């Protein structure tokens, strides 16, 4: 497999401070540059609209990088500097799920992506 033309996306399951609170993310993705990817984060064990949802990523060998957050009541997203344009936060409150979509993937998007309450 020619890894120079592929981008590996990893997502991780995260658990809240209380054992009944869970954020379960979709599985890892392998995408080519220029493609798009949509990561899901399904919440359970709490009222979804009572807490904002944050997105954070960690590139290989790097520290955590906060990407921004989405207001789960209004659906209004706030993006950190450097994450406007190709990055889209969205929600489906009927299934308590937040989404991160990345368009026009670049090699530098290779990272582990986390949702965080």
Curated annotation (Swiss-Prot):
Sequence segments annotated as region (Framework-1)? 20-44
Gene3D superfamilies, per database record: Immunoglobulins
Q: Does the keyword Cell membrane apply?
A: yes
Annotated GO biological process: immunoglobulin mediated immune response
Q: Name one GO molecular function term.
A: antigen binding
Q: Record's Gene Ontology CC terms?
A: extracellular region; immunoglobulin complex; plasma membrane
Matches recorded under Pfam families: V-set
Q: Which cell locations does it reside in?
A: Secreted; Cell membrane
Q: Where is this region: Complementarity-determining-2?
A: 70-77
**What is the annotated role of this protein in its UniProt record?**
V region of the variable domain of immunoglobulin heavy chains that participates in the antigen recognition. Immunoglobulins, also known as antibodies, are membrane-bound or secreted glycoproteins produced by B lymphocytes. In the recognition phase of humoral immunity, the membrane-bound immunoglobulins serve as receptors which, upon binding of a specific antigen, trigger the clonal expansion and differentiation of B lymphocytes into immunoglobulins-secreting plasma cells.
The name on file for this protein is Immunoglobulin heavy variable 7-4-1
Q: Which organism is it from?
A: Homo sapiens (Human)
Q: Gene name?
A: IGHV7-4-1
